[in-house]
Amino acid sequence: MASSPITSWEIDGETVADFIFLGSKITADGDCSHEIKRCLLLGRKVMTNLDSILKSRDITLPIKVHLVKVMVFPVVMYGCESWTIKKAECRRIYAFELWCWRRLLRVPWTARRSNQSLLKEISPGCSLEGLMLKLKLQYFGHLMRRADSFEKTLMLGKIEDRRRRG
């Protein structure tokens, strides 16, 4: 798991393949598909816990939509600022969002109802992927406004060091 000690930046440490940081699993290759799957499963669990509320006929549809946006989506989006979302993960996120809306409207997966008709009935405004992109851009803007920080230097690619020959 561990390799030779790190000697740059005067830090004594070792290189590991993966570690947990602020509740997120960070891997050496930067792959975060497992983290996205974990958050989607947590969101699915929250959605199933809301079943009794979502099946209630006393609560109107706009309130149910707002409940999903406020109670389910933040669980899924926790830490999404650091994710690298590929096409496969994008499809998973879109499928999860539509699963939430189908569950909200009590439409079975066997029903031949288009996704567009669901979205038209719900009218959610911004998609889950769009909300994630908004959070990423807000975080990027926050980093760029900082005066002198390691994160800003890293994002701009201005780490000065000697490059080996070759």
What annotation goes with each model-predicted range?
Residues 1-166:
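Short linear motifs embedded in intrinsically disordered, charge-biased segments
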